[in-house]
C-alpha cells in the first residue's frame, strides 16, 4: 500500500490546483461528460484561504483535490440542517486515475464527518451525468432528487 497524506491545500498550491481543474475540464470535454466549462478561481482561492480545500499527496505529488462545506443551502434547501459535510469539486490528477482516489477522499470525509459531529455526507452533480451518479451510488450514496439551481452569484461555477 502506498503511503499518502490528506492535508489542506495552501496558496502555494494554487497554480497546480488550477492546472488540475484545467486538465479535468479537457478530459470531461473529450469524454463527453457535462460537468464544468470553466474554473471559478475566486471560489477556489476562498476554499484554500478558509481551509476547506484538501489535497491527497503521495511523495511530492498532489494526486487529488476536493473541497468541503458545512452548509449548502442553495443546493440542499430545507435538508441543510447543520448535520452534514458537503463534498464538492473532486479532481483527480490524471497520472493517478484508476487508483481509488475517491475511496481515500470518502474514508477521510467519513472520519471528518464523525469528528465534526455530523450525520451525513452529501454530494451533488449534474442531473444528466448518469455515469457519475452511478459511480457515487456504488459507494453507498443514495439519489435524493433532481433540482435545478438558480444563477445565484453565491454558487461557484463548479458547484
Residue ranges and their predicted role:
Residues 78-94:
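Conserved acetyl-CoA binding element of GNAT-fold acetyltransferases
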Residues 119, 126-129, 139, 146-159:
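C-terminal "cap" of GNAT-fold acetyltransferases
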Residues 92, 98-111, 137-138:
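Conserved acetyl-CoA-binding loop-helix of GNAT-fold acetyltransferases
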Residues 45-55, 86:
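A short helix-loop-beta-strand connector motif used in the catalytic cores of GNAT acetyltransferases and
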Residues 22-45:
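Conserved GNAT-fold acetyl-CoA-binding loop/helix
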Residues 4-19:
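A short beta-loop-alpha structural element at the N-terminal edge
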Residues 61-72, 86, 91:
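Conserved beta-strand in the GNAT
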Amino acid at each position: 500500500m502506498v503511503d499518502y497524506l490528506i492535508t489542506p491545500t495552501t496558496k502555494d498550491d494554487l497554480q497546480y490546483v488550477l492546472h488540475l481543474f484545467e486538465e479535468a475540464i479537457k478530459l470531461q470535454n473529450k469524454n463527453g461528460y457535462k460537468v464544468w466549462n470553466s474554473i471559478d478561481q475566486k471560489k477556489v482561492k476562498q476554499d484554500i484561504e478558509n481551509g476547506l480545500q484538501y489535497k491527497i499527496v503521495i511523495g511530492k505529488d498532489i494526486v487529488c483535490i476536493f473541497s468541503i462545506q458545512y452548509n449548502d443551502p442553495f443546493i440542499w434547501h430545507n435538508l441543510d440542517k447543520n448535520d452534514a459535510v458537503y463534498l464538492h469539486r473532486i479532481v483527480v490528477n490524471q497520472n493517478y486515475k484508476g487508483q481509488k482516489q475517491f475511496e481515500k477522499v470518502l474514508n477521510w470525509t467519513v472520519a471528518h464527518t464523525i469528528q465534526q459531529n455530523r450525520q451525513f455526507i452529501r454530494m451533488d452533480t449534474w442531473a444528466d451525468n448518469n455515469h457519475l451518479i452511478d459511480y457515487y451510488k456504488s459507494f453507498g450514496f443514495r439519489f435524493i432528487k433532481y433540482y435545478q439551481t438558480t444563477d445565484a452569484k453565491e454558487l461557484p461555477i463548479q458547484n
